[in-house]
């Protein structure tokens, strides 16, 4: 009897054993996501039928994208001047909802992308996954667009900071605007390497927005510095891969005779890849500078104050 029950349980459990094609409990999440979104939008948006076309979807043309980003800067810097005379708002509940929503959405985009890219990387290798046209699939294009739209929702981070009278740093404001532009640039440039910085960024954002949610809930978190460290590591990994793809692109275009054993024209426009590399490089330097300023010099000055008091 016990043996039969054990075999029954093992048989049921085996149905949820992860595979390369279905890494999350042997469930193809993309199908469930497609059905859920189709139901929620009453069939108006079906992820499986989506195709990114410049001028067809919201914020798919350069002019409205640049206008939206410009409006973001006008609102936050103009708003900061307007609210100076007002009392800072706490907005605790709104901050909790905002951050919990973004950590959840980031996690959803992340697992859906991992589900799509894991079989490609496993069967064809990393080089294929960052260069070949077949790694730019319809589900990934849909997820890239949804992730891109999320970047405009993240602008609310800064609006909440302004209403709370929090200090705005150059890193924060530059990063938000540049990331929206970066995601758009990679979408229109059809760069196969896009999934690398996007998935790494989503993984960090899951932790980052969870940290913000806990902070908004009044919970003190000891691992705040680790979020910045992870962001720095993320940009380092991004740049290793992106600069390699840019190198391959340049060699394939101008120095065919100097090709490495693996050398092909990686999918994506040269301009999009170069612009992406430039923006990610600026992020790396800015985040390292921020980390030194806040966690290294800040802790050193704190120790000096303690010594003076003693």
Curated annotation (Swiss-Prot):
PROSITE patterns: ELO (PS01188)
Superkingdom in the source lineage: Eukaryota
Function: Component of a microsomal membrane bound medium-chain fatty acid elongation system, which extends medium-chain-length fatty acids to long-chain fatty acids. Component of elongase I, which extends 12-16-carbon fatty acyl-CoAs such as lauroyl-CoA to 14-18-carbon fatty acids by incorporation of malonyl-CoA.
Catalytic activity field: a very-long-chain acyl-CoA + malonyl-CoA + H(+) = a very-long-chain 3-oxoacyl-CoA + CO2 + CoA; tetradecanoyl-CoA + malonyl-CoA + H(+) = 3-oxohexadecanoyl-CoA + CO2 + CoA; (9Z)-tetradecenoyl-CoA + malonyl-CoA + H(+) = 3-oxo-(11Z)-hexadecenoyl-CoA + CO2 + CoA
Predominant cellular place of this UniProt entry's protein: endoplasmic reticulum
Name assigned to this protein: Fatty acid elongase 1
One matching Pfam family: ELO
Single biological process term from Gene Ontology: very long-chain fatty acid biosynthetic process
Reported induction: Induced in wild-type cells supplemented with 14:0 fatty acids and repressed when cells are supplied with 16- and 18-carbon fatty acids.
Additional free-text comment from the UniProt record: Present with 937 molecules/cell in log phase SD medium.
Transmembrane segments: 64-84, 101-121, 142-163, 175-196, 202-223, 235-255, 272-292
Lipid bilayer topology: Multi-pass membrane protein
Topological domain ranges for the Lumenal compartment: 1-63, 122-141, 197-201, 256-271
Record carries keyword Transmembrane: yes
EC number: 2.3.1.199
Family label: Belongs to the ELO family.
Record-level Gene Ontology MF annotations: fatty acid elongase activity
Keyword terms of this UniProt record: Endoplasmic reticulum, Fatty acid biosynthesis, Fatty acid metabolism, Lipid biosynthesis, Lipid metabolism, Membrane, Transferase, Transmembrane, Transmembrane helix
InterPro entries: ELO_CS, ELO_fam
One GO term describing the cellular component: endoplasmic reticulum
Protein's UniProt keywords contain NAD: no
Compartments where found: Endoplasmic reticulum membrane
Species the sequence originates in: Saccharomyces cerevisiae (strain ATCC 204508 / S288c)
Parts of the chain on the Cytoplasmic side: 85-100, 164-174, 224-234, 293-310
Chain location of the short sequence motif Di-lysine motif per the record: 304-307
């Amino acid at each position: 009897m016990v043996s039969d029950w054990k075999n029954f349980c093992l048989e049921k459990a085996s149905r949820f054993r992860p595979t390369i094609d279905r890494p999350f409990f042997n469930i193809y999440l993309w199908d469930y996501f497609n059905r859920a979104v189709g139901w929620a939008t009453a069939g108006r948006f079906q992820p499986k039928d989506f195709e990114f076309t410049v001028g067809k979807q919201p914020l798919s043309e350069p002019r409205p994208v640049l206008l939206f980003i410009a409006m973001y800067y006008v609102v936050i810097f103009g708003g900061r001047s307007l609210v100076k005379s007002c009392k800072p708002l706490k907005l605790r509940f709104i901050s909790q909802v905002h951050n919990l929503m973004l950590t959840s959405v980031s996690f959803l985009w992340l697992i859906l992308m991992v589900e799509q890219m894991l079989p490609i990387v496993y069967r064809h290798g990393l080089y294929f996954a960052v260069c070949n046209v077949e790694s730019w699939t319809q589900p990934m294009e849909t997820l890239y667009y949804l992730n891109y739209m999320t970047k405009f929702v993240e602008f609310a981070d800064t609006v909440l900071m302004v209403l709370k009278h929090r200090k705005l740093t150059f890193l924060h404001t530059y990063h938000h605007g540049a990331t929206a532009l970066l995601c758009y640039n990679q979408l229109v440039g059809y760069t196969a390497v896009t999934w690398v910085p996007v998935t790494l960024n989503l993984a960090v954002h899951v932790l980052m927005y969870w940290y913000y949610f806990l902070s908004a809930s009044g919970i003190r978190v000891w691992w705040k510095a680790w979020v910045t460290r992870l962001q720095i590591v993320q940009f380092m990994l991004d740049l290793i891969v992106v600069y390699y793809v840019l190198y391959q692109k340049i060699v394939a275009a101008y120095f065919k005779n100097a090709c490495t054993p693996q050398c092909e024209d990686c999918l994506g426009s040269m301009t999009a890849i170069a612009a992406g590399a430039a923006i990610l490089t600026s992020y790396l330097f800015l985040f390292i500078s921020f980390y030194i300023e806040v966690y290294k010099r800040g802790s050193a000055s704190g120790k000096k104050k303690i010594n003076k008091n003693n």
